[in-house]
Amino acid sequence: MIDTYDSSKIKILRGLDAVRKRPGMYIGDTDDGSGLHHMVFEIVDNSIDEALAGFCKEIKVVIHSDNSVSIKDDGRGIPTDIHPEEKISAAEVIMTVLHSGGKFDNASYKISGGLHGVGISVVNALSEKLELIIYKNKKKYRQQYKNGNPESPLCIIGATEITGTYIRFWPSYKIFTNKTQFQYEILSKRLRELSFLNSNILIHLKDNRTNLEEKYHYKGGIKAFIKFLNKNKFPINLNIFYFRCIKNQIELEIAIQWNNSHQENILCFTNNIPQKDGGTHLSGFRAGITRTLNLHIEREGYNKKNKTIITGEDTREGLTAIISIKIPDPKFSSQTKDKLVSSEVKSVIESLINENLIEYLLENPIDAKFIIQKIINSAKIREAARRAREINKKKGTLDLGTLPGKLSDCQENDPKLSEIYLVEGDSAGGSAKQGRNRKNQAILPLKGKILNVQKTKFDKIILSQELTSLITALGCSITKSEYSLDKLRYNHIIIMTDADVDGAHIRTLLLTFFYRQLPELIKKGYVYIAQPPLYKVKKGKQEKYIKNDEEMNKYQIKIALKEIVIKNKKNENCNKIIKEFQKIVSDFNHIQIKMKKNKNYFPELILNELIYHPRLYNLKNENVVQNWIEKLVEKLNKKDKNNTIYTSKIKRNENDSIFEPSIKLSRYANHTQYDLKNDFLESKEYFLITNLGEKFKKFQENENFIEKGEKIYKINDIKNTLEWLIKETKRGFFVQRYKGLGEMNPDQLWNTTMNPETRNMLQVTIKDAISANNLFNTLMGDLVEPRRKFIQKNALKAENIDI
């Protein structure tokens, strides 16, 4: 029976109900984490608008330990007086009424990123709780909200000499149900961008969960941004092309530098808001660059001999550019402002590019010559690659209609249901072929190390047999003229390599290929890394597969603590003592794992000694700090067995009038310094470490002995006791460490790595594209010195090195 469709079925969503009902319209995707982080950006953008108006110099963003986020600025502060129409405070209007704000009349803000008056009210609507504090008129105001509704009117809670706004919000987990944790890297990327775009603002970011903290204050504006993006690349034009001017109320700022890479990297911003999908400013930029450079090449006769046709792609190969426009009333395709659609922008940018770039090329003839040479060379390589493809197609060696012979394809035709495993080596490929589900799992074995595409020209890439097989198997092509995501044959591309150094290298080469040649596959979430087990543990007829060292450590501790007996001279309750010891071991392991994931990670020996070393309370007394660190270093030098020399020093922190100790490790040619800063010494982690030491000291006073089977061990150190227990436990176990996938038979490979019900896979994502770009340049690029420095800096953190 069909329900009657009449006026009773028409629902009116009032106030913020519409936001809660359809949050994606206002904030973006609430499942993939982008909408969650957009909440922070909406508030930060308001602070930036205050800066653009000349009233804000400092912004502080904090991720709190309960996963709430606070944003504080020193702007004018949200208005607190009573709104003449709504009869409530202006602050409450802004927080609870859609399309309210001070950016509609262009009087309070000439330029702003906020346009629709929905940003902060949307954040409030999608928050379980929100706290608002305003510093204004020498008064401190406060108001709290629950699910978008005020719990009480705005009230004065004290006096103040500062101005600004503080907002702390707790996202509603009824709205954000999938990805609920704020990612430091995503926030860091955006705040770094804002610092480059607004070089007069100091921006702080702190994560109380991990003690990560950064300050962003880049002088040099977008020219400094270009240098940051081109880090570890060879610049083609040493003098960055830069101009800033205003035309038809459009303020345009552009910086460009070409480099020796093969990828273009253009970032677009409107009123400081990024447009990941570009828009009319990007269209105008591309048209202006292509037209101007072709005109200059023709006028100066650079291309007389070869008459090579120059395309837009050729002019932009290796180009890094920042386009930043400021416009009074920009038009975007949606509330998330991912694409600019203001039609008047395109022609203005195109004409300004033409005027300023011609002037730059004439005033910088050496830079101009190198730029044009690169462009012509790119065009020649493109033509050579096209001819090579045509020849190979005629020969049948690159027939994109024919799948590579080594591919064992699946029966499924729907890409959403299909998987392809890129397997290291023919041996593992054979096992994978036998163990797979033929219905939807394809196998492509890759022989040896593929080309490093970071420093390989395109014509060489398409002639590489392994890469050609991979490109053909995927079906979507990598050439810009032929690339089509609709032709992709698999939506699950799984990299499966050995757990050794060679496997890690091959995995990195494949990730470099996808990042540089098929970045959209990573953005769409199609690329995965298989997690084959590192260990097989066998006791009698029982077998268990363990995926990594951390899990192996947990498993060993769990088994080691079983069937133990603890005795002491007082003959106290054995079960009670065992529980105490198990808690100490559990806390010890928890601290080690937590510290390794923390920015304040110290080497194991330092961490262990901090447990037994007295807690450092008084950082204001230089002698106390000096004595404390010297005694710690003395212990470290006595206990170290790895030829490491430990030295200490203390440094005065002028801001807080305290003394902070540090430890320097010297091993062979490597020197690493670990600072024990006030943030760490007052952190939860340091309290846990020293508290564990105090617990163990009391436990140790009773002279406890541990029995495992027929053996007895005196408990005098947590780490050594645990190692002894694990060693004794291993006697009844057979532990196999898999170095290669080929060591597994087909059934084992299926059960551990390929069965969707039991396998573990890592989805490849990019939280911070700029940092990812710099990392690929460092590790896979031509420059040796940055790579050497990176290795030296991280050498002491390396684990599981094959020797």
UniProtKB/Swiss-Prot annotation:
Compartment(s): Cytoplasm
Protein's UniProt keywords contain ATP-binding: yes
Residues the record lists as binding Mg(2+) 1: 424, 498
Record-listed E.C. numbers: 5.6.2.2
Molecular-function GO terms, alphabetical: ATP binding; DNA binding; DNA topoisomerase type II (double strand cut, ATP-hydrolyzing) activity; metal ion binding
EC supergroup of this enzyme: isomerase
Entries under SUPFAM superfamilies matching the protein: ATPase domain of HSP90 chaperone/DNA topoisomerase II/histidine kinase, Ribosomal protein S5 domain 2-like, Type II DNA topoisomerase
Positions bearing the site annotation: Interaction with DNA: 449, 452
Gene Ontology CC: one annotated term: chromosome
SMART domains hit by this protein: HATPase_c (SM00387), TOP2c (SM00433)
Family classification: Belongs to the type II topoisomerase GyrB family.
HAMAP family noted in UniProt: GyrB
Miscellaneous field: Few gyrases are as efficient as E.coli at forming negative supercoils. Not all organisms have 2 type II topoisomerases; in organisms with a single type II topoisomerase this enzyme also has to decatenate newly replicated chromosomes.
Protein name in the entry: DNA gyrase subunit B
Organism: Buchnera aphidicola subsp. Schizaphis graminum (strain Sg)
Encoding gene (name): gyrB
